Amino acid sequence: MQKKSKQIINNENLPLYLFHQGTNYNSYEYMGAHFCAKNGENCVVFRVWAPNADSVSVVGDFNGWDKTKTVMKRISINGVFEAEVFGLNEYDVYKYAVTNNGKTVLKADPYAFHAETPPGTASKLYKIDGYIWNDQDFIYNKTTPYDKPVNVYEVNLGSWKKHKDGSYYTYRELADKLLDYVIKLGYTHIEIMPICEFPFDGSWGYQCVSYFAISSRFGTPKDFMYFIDVAHQKGLSVILDWVPSHFPKDEHGLYEFDGTCCYEYKDEFKKEHKEWGTRVFDWGKCEVQSFLISSAMFLLEKFHLDGLRVDAVSSMLYLDYGRKDGEWLPNSNGENLNLEAIAFLKKLNEVIFARFPNALMVAEESTSYPMVTKPTDKGGLGFNFKWNMGWMNDVLSYVECDPYFRSKTHDKLTFSLFYAFNENFILPISHDEVVHGKKSLIDKMPGDIYNKFSQIRAFNAYMFSHPGKKLNFMGNEYGQFREWDYKNGLEFFMLKFPMHKKLLNYNITLNNIYKNTPSLYEIEDSWEGFKWISPDERDNNVISYYRTDTNGNSIYVIINFSGNDYIDYRLGLEKGTYKLILNSNAKKYGGSGQVKGKTFRTIRKSAHGNKNSIKFNLPKFTALYFIKTQN
């Protein structure tokens, strides 16, 4: 057995062997379509996995889409087929004609590097190598930002802006327009909603069919490389949404690829998310592991992405996710956990961090599943960040409540601190919160226009001073009232109105305060970085606290979420002089200007358990940040 194993390892078919073992993490270099030279001629080698197919052919314009002309040869007993075709050119279109039990279906190449723009469904030949990068300094200096500012601008490339004729901005146009805008606003990261090729615009990219082909709606793969290259040169990190949880049932895609359940589970209790109308990957299958992990590695390697946000992790973890009683079966331990998915996620993160130690692997996980961001050798899933969905649901529920009744829901403001240090959290106000009748962020705020703007300013100050990294969806920055609509660009014309322009300026100020104030981001994992001043003023709808950095410097925060003005409010602080560095009530931001003064000296009058305090007016829906300038 040892001799046979050695022969296999030394064989030229090592990539094929590893692919079937679930350990070929660069399988895109072997599978798919690759240009090469044979006997002095240009040749393309095609390889595809279709284990239960009776036959597979390569078809395209080059052979009149005739499945009898370029029949592929089975080169492994586990179902990899291969063919060599001469005389093809880059951008030529092709598919695989996969036949099972007399039925032939034309399939896009799962490993294609490029694809036709929908509604076209064919794959395109593409030379993925050759882009000359200019981001070496950025890559060299990259670190994992546990103690650094992370402020993410989440964007849908197809609907940030559109041309007057309704056409998309290209990757190269977005590199000029979008990136400069994001930099101007003071963000540190940009997160792009999924752009692995997807057929249905209404899926927002979350139902993709080509895990190695960046959407051609916006240009070529090298155009996207240019986008990321420019982002890095401007100091901006790029995260991409990635969906290893499920895929759509489009006939040309992964769905029953070889005429049977190939990439998806065969088990009727596992194979489909009926709520979404999609198929579920079989993460226990070795070839699926090679496929998905290779996709993640490909995106990080070839495009220099700084991280992946893994979508719908909860749907992977639980066998009963979205399923009623009788629609799922427990695992071998009698639990509702999908052990294969858990093992896959751990393996994914181990492989990623072995090659890209400073990558961001962000889990969108909406339950209280433990240790999502703990290392796998300590029993965790191995991600390094997780969206804090509990915080998001609680605080949005709180701010949507009429201020008169907020005292009854005060715990929603404070409960998150009971678990804030259990994981490495990102606080997400994402696209999911501004669609489907949920209203835009500013329109969630009760009251008239003036009060809506006042409350969103206070809310943002709360978010940026709460432990956890930050994420906001496009349009939140200037208070778009219309819900996000993937068919249309953002309403930037709203910036002609003073209140929207002032809100944008306020958020720029807030972003820059966050980015330049270590106490707001250095210590996110313990009480050393956060202390309450007064968590329980529920009758007043007021909270106060301070954040501290590793050098002992602090920023002091007080927020009034009530509709009442508090005159001569006292905030208990240590003896000293304090400077007001953020006032959400300032006239320049659209407020009433009721907070007078910029410097405040404590007097010997107790408040909040301190012997000393400062005094100021605290108007309704107002947030204030102070720093200590003198003892």
Spans of model-derived segments:
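C-terminal accessory region downstream of the catalytic core in glycan-modifying enzymes
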Residues: 503-504, 510-512, 570-601
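The feature marks proteins involved in alpha-glucan
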Residues: 1-45, 75-154, 159-166, 173, ...
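Conserved alpha/beta catalytic core and glycan-binding cleft of carbohydrate-active enzymes
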Residues: 118-119, 304-306, 324-489, 494, ...
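C-terminal beta-strand-rich structural cap/linker in extracellular carbohydrate-active enzymes
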Residues: 90-94, 597-631
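Conserved, mostly hydrophobic/aromatic
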Residues: 48, 96, 155, 182, ...
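Substrate-binding/active-site clefts of carbohydrate-active enzymes
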Residues: 116, 137-149, 156-337, 600
